[in-house]
A protein has these predicted regions:
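Alpha-solenoid helical repeat scaffolds
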Residues: 1-112, 128, 132-136, 141, ...
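Short linear, low-complexity motifs centered on an aromatic residue
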Residues: 110-120
Length: 218
């Protein structure tokens, strides 16, 4: 990062404008944020800017979805930080930013990102945690008036997520003769299955109109 970029980042983090417009400020500082995350430089400042800006944006219900030019690169970088950074607080903040960012994304992109996160075997911690992000998106969709254009309330939801979330990984997990109880307990799969069953319970409880066709699509 250049000296001027660092100065811009520090000013944005510690002296934010009280009348900041998130749809103007984010695109202008995006290259600096991306560089900061990629190099692990001034990461606390970058996450603070993103949390504050996205939270402010979330409070303005009339704003449209964020541009993919913003959401796609950040959603590509943040999962690794949220999964493997050495500082637990940084991991938590990165995950919070990812949640806010997905909530501000176009629905189709949010859907695609969640499919990728829940099926990414290279980031097992995120594969578990992202089930909660799917639940968050589903509950948000179910809280809105029925809309045929909401991708989370169509049969595509279980066509896409059913084989990822509602089956063990690997598929022969419980029939394998080589699996021991200790191996199973030490893996990420028990926690992932608990999260998936929690999501399915929410789906059964809240989707009273069978909008995602949950009884016939599995």
């Amino acid at each position: 990062m250049s000296d001027s970029s660092t100065i811009d980042l520090i000013i944005a983090a510690y002296q934010p404008s009280p009348e900041i417009n998130p749809d103007i400020s984010l695109p202008s500082i995006l290259p600096v944020l991306i560089s900061s995350i990629q190099t692990n430089s001034f990461l606390d400042e970058s996450l603070a800017i993103l949390i504050r800006t996205l939270h402010l944006r979330q409070s303005k219900a009339s704003l449209p979805s964020l541009s993919p030019h913003i959401t796609v690169p950040l959603c590509g970088l943040l999962p690794a930080v949220a999964s493997s950074h050495s500082d637990p607080l940084t991991r938590h903040q990165a995950f919070r930013v990812l949640s806010l960012l997905l909530g501000a994304s176009e629905p189709q992109l949010r859907f695609r990102h969640l499919v990728e996160l829940t099926s990414d075997s290279e980031l097992p911690q995120m594969r578990v945690a992202s089930v909660g992000l799917v639940k968050e998106a589903l509950l948000e969709a179910l809280s809105l008036p029925p809309n045929d254009e909401n991708i989370f309330l169509t049969s595509l939801f279980l066509h896409s997520f059913g084989t990822i979330l509602f089956r063990p990984n690997p598929s022969d997990l419980f029939t394998s003769a080589n699996l021991t109880l200790s191996d199973f307990q030490e893996s990420h799969e028990p926690q992932r299955l608990v999260e998936c069953l929690s999501l399915y319970y929410v789906l059964l409880l809240r989707d009273k109109n069978n909008l995602v066709c949950h009884l016939t699509c599995l």
